């Protein structure tokens, strides 16, 4: 991957490994969308658009030769730069076990937030509709644990009516979930009751959304399409610091909105 220019960086193999490993650790916990949507690819840096399998006919009816354009989603290319102190990185070679990578860590969190923003809320300029865009798939939910369980049962009833199989997953705002746990009563934990309702699915708490949604994880309904997966490259050297960047190319497609239900508190 020459475009990353990693071989030009004044960094050792051990330093690159530490940077990559730390970024991977944070991405693993902060990429909430990837915990329940299908991930396709990566198809490579040159993959510029994802075909939608449709043709928009643009020719007139009276034309002998009919023609149109194939529909596709252009990939979003993101790039976020950060700097690291070279002397601090050299401390890694001296045996220091916990070098300061705070600039990297903060940038990784911002990149993860951007990807999740596209998955949940979409990106109008790139033609992406996010999961929360489908207001017609919304049901109201009260503020008690009983209300939550009833809303999940209603959501599953809608899935059954629409022929959407499970397992099902509850994606819920972290603070909302904590408040439900505080209010739960009885000897049987709320978490267990919810998991039983979801029929083999799971509970994902996230700060990315204000309310909640129930989704089917049967597969094929929500696709995160990757060209170049999250990667770190070299940009420049600034005296005693090195400027690096995180890049990714991707798009997101809701293939079947019937596989999600929004819960509005």
Swiss-Prot record:
A Gene Ontology biological process term: intracellular iron ion homeostasis
Coiled-coil regions listed: none
Binding site for FMN: 79-81, 87, 235
One Gene Ontology term, aspect cellular component: encapsulin nanocompartment
A Pfam family per the record: Linocin_M18
Keywords: Encapsulin nanocompartment, Flavoprotein, FMN, Ion transport, Iron, Iron storage, Iron transport, Transport
Entry keyword Transferase: no
Cofactors required: FMN
Subunit organization: This encapsulin nanocompartment is formed by 60 subunits; monomers form pentamers which assemble to form shells. There are 12 pores where the pentamers meet as well as 3-fold axis channels and dimer channels; none are larger than 3-4 Angstroms in diameter. The N-terminus of the protein is inside the shell, the C-terminus is outside.
Family (UniProt): Belongs to the encapsulin family. Family 1 subfamily.
PANTHER family xref list: PEPTIDASE U56 FAMILY (PTHR37165), TYPE 1 ENCAPSULIN SHELL PROTEIN (PTHR37165:SF1)
Task of the protein: Shell component of a type 1 encapsulin nanocompartment. Assembles into proteinaceous shells 23-24 nm in diameter with 2-2.5 nm thick walls. Cargo protein Flp (ferritin-like protein, may store iron) is targeted to the interior via its C-terminal extension.
Protein name (Swiss-Prot/TrEMBL): Type 1 encapsulin shell protein
Species name: Thermotoga petrophila (strain ATCC BAA-488 / DSM 13995 / JCM 10881 / RKU-1)
Gene encoding the protein: enc
């Amino acid at each position: 991957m020459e475009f990353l220019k990693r071989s030009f960086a004044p960094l050792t193999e051990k330093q690159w490994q530490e940077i990559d490993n730390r970024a991977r650790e944070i991405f693993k916990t902060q990429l909430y969308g990837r915990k329940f949507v299908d991930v396709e690819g990566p198809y490579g840096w040159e993959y510029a658009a994802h075909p939608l399998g449709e043709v928009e006919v643009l020719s007139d009816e009276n034309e002998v030769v009919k023609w149109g354009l194939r529909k596709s989603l252009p990939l979003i290319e993101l790039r976020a730069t950060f700097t690291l102190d070279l002397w601090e990185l050299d401390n890694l070679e001296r045996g220091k076990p916990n070098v300061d990578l705070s600039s990297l860590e903060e940038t990784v969190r911002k990149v993860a937030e951007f990807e999740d923003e596209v998955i949940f809320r979409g990106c109008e300029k790139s033609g992406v509709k996010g999961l929360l865009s489908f207001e017609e798939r919304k049901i109201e939910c009260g503020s008690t644990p009983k209300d939550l369980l009833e809303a999940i049962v209603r959501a599953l009833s809608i899935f059954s009516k629409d022929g959407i199989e499970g397992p099902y997953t509850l994606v819920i705002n972290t603070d909302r979930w904590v408040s439900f746990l505080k209010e739960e009563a009885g000897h049987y934990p709320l978490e267990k009751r919810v998991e039983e309702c979801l029929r083999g699915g799971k509970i994902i708490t996230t700060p990315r959304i204000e309310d909640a949604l129930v989704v089917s994880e049967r597969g094929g309904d929500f696709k995160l399409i990757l060209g170049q997966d999250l990667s770190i490259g070299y940009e420049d050297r600034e005296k005693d610091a090195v400027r690096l960047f995180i890049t990714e190319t991707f798009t997101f497609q809701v293939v079947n909105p019937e596989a999600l239900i929004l819960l509005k508190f």
